[in-house]
């Protein structure tokens, strides 16, 4: 049994309007979640594989998306929930946060 608390593993973007993936994170019921070192890596993967842009209202847009993070428990969390997890687990130096009101940025933890 793993007694380690849930922690942030990587940046991720949930593309809600794209076709549902076969093995999504356990708290996602539609769309796909793309993971990467930074959020721009996720955007680049979608653009490269689908030629769609990460914008909502455009003929070549992906539709609704949410920037967030994946956790060690295979959950997608938004920037605000990720900030709480990262603070609880000591993954961030609270005196050096990029924009704590917006939520966690990958630059805050690595």
Model-flagged regions — what are they?
Residues 1-66, 71-110:
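Linear-motif-rich, low-complexity cytosolic tails and juxtamembrane regions
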């Amino acid at each position: 049994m793993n007694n380690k608390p849930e922690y942030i593993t990587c940046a991720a973007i949930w593309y809600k309007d794209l076709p549902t993936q076969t093995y999504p994170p356990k708290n996602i019921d539609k769309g796909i979640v793309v993971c990467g070192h930074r959020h721009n890596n996720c955007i680049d993967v979608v653009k490269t594989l689908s030629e769609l842009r990460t914008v909502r209202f455009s003929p070549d847009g992906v539709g609704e998306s949410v920037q967030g993070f994946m956790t060690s428990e295979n959950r997608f969390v938004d920037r605000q929930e990720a900030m709480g997890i990262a603070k609880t687990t000591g993954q961030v130096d609270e005196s050096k946060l990029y924009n704590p009101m917006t939520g966690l940025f990958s630059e805050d933890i690595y």
